[in-house]
Amino acid sequence: MALSDLVLLRWLRDSRHSRKLILFIVFLALLLDNMLLTVVVPIIPSYLYSIKHEKNSTEIQTTRPELVVSTSESIFSYYNNSTVLITGNATGTLPGGQSHKATSTQHTVANTTVPSDCPSEDRDLLNENVQVGLLFASKATVQLLTNPFIGLLTNRIGYPIPMFAGFCIMFISTVMFAFSSSYAFLLIARSLQGIGSSCSSVAGMGMLASVYTDDEERGKPMGIALGGLAMGVLVGPPFGSVLYEFVGKTAPFLVLAALVLLDGAIQLFVLQPSRVQPESQKGTPLTTLLKDPYILIAAGSICFANMGIAMLEPALPIWMMETMCSRKWQLGVAFLPASISYLIGTNIFGILAHKMGRWLCALLGMVIVGISILCIPFAKNIYGLIAPNFGVGFAIGMVDSSMMPIMGYLVDLRHVSVYGSVYAIADVAFCMGYAIGPSAGGAIAKAIGFPWLMTIIGIIDIAFAPLCFFLRSPPAKEEKMAILMDHNCPIKRKMYTQNNVQSYPIGDDEESESD
């Protein structure tokens, strides 16, 4: 028993320096972050609607007896499913104290059976587009504002401490979601999640770029890490909707909180976040990176591709409740095809994109996103959403798995190979999509309708696609070109950082990979 314990401790000690274990930590952090991001998608619209109408339903029950005139009788007809009201000559009192004289008349009231899950033609439901959109956008807005600071922080103190801070904040946010019973507390929990997400995503992607220094090799681990994001998006909505309907609102968040604790324990042991590990060289200033047109094109692709699904998240469940009479569990399951296809897309094109050209992969992805989004309003039921949602997810997977590695490649090619700031920009682009998408999407859906909302974002994605052509062969800066000519190596980029890899170093079993 003691020998097995020693073997386990030795394995853990050796694994601490493994790139694969670091990849697993980033994968798990992105998985849980995006599960929390999407688990609220089917819960919040229905939960806010139920909170708002609990009071209204109580008031209706107390006022309903006043509407019945004592001299009236009702006869239900099974022939045509209608109710005939027969009233005699009498004077009754209507709500508000108004006097009303009834005569002997017959009023036929058609009985239409409307499911309780189908609040169509409800003005409150239409207005909820804006409220839900702002709630969803708050996380991305806070993350958008926090990312530049996290990028600079990682350059100064390294990646482990911000990574662990992201875990702590996400745990607090998850518990707040579980026990929040008002819109204000939900808004605070969602905003707090934005800070935690910023720490996890910027530090995580920067950490991967620093340990996988070869451009061709880097695509695969980043595709796997984005697979964690995809898994979170995949599992979140159905996981949340099923537990919400059959267990309650608190259940999905408590399960997530337990998983987040597990992630924190692994980070604490492997990354040792108490140690400050600054970068060995000074990175390119954030303002300089923001002036690079090639970085801006890559960031724009990430932003507009993800803006499509971000607009769908608050608007699609409400549109389904209004037009399809969808049940609670269906509101989350509708996103399942997009989530599955995103997972497929990131894993396939994480490897394939480098061979076919990342610019071409992103260009095709933007076009497919636009076409798929344009098809969504034509769906008449939940089955009609399968194909377009599958196309949306698959295409966004193409874009993300192409553009995330190319951000690191552009820094290697044109700037100093320090990755915190450039992945802060990538995450800012992602967050802009998720900040502008829900907030603007909710307002547009309320003003001109859901179909026009889909038309607008679909056209924007297709129009942006040709700009990806400029990423086909981005030029190197003069000093970088001199290095390339000296080493006579126009493709491999690993010489830029192979002497500056941080101390989550490569294990003995993997040193041969970097030779």
Curated annotation (Swiss-Prot):
Gene3D superfamilies assigned to the protein according to its UniProt record, in alphabetical order: MFS general substrate transporter like domains (1.20.1250.20)
InterPro entries, per the entry: MFS, MFS_dom, MFS_trans_sf, MFS_Vesicular_Transporter, Multidrug-R
Recorded superkingdom: Eukaryota
A GO BP entry: response to zinc ion
Subcellular localization(s) per the UniProt record: Cytoplasmic vesicle, Secretory vesicle, Synaptic vesicle membrane; Cytoplasmic vesicle, Secretory vesicle membrane; Cell projection, Axon; Cell projection, Dendrite
Chief localisation class: membrane
Residues modified by glycosylation: 56, 80-81, 89, 111
Keyword field contains Disulfide bond: yes
Activity control, per UniProt: Strongly inhibited by reserpine and tetrabenazine. Also inhibited to a lesser extent by ketanserin and fenfluramine. Reserpine and ketanserin inhibit by blocking the substrate-binding pocket. Tetrabenazine traps SLC18A2/VMAT2 in an occluded conformation and its inhibition is specific to SLC18A2/VMAT2 but not SLC18A1/VMAT1.
Membrane topology term: Multi-pass membrane protein
Disulfide bridge positions per record: 118-325
Transmembrane regions: 21-41, 131-151, 161-181, 191-211, 221-243, 250-272, 293-312, 330-353, 359-379, 391-411, 416-436, 442-463
Listed PANTHER family: GH10249P, SYNAPTIC VESICULAR AMINE TRANSPORTER
Oligomer and partners: Interacts with SLC6A3.
The name this protein goes by in its record: Synaptic vesicular amine transporter
Organism: Rattus norvegicus
Gene: Slc18a2
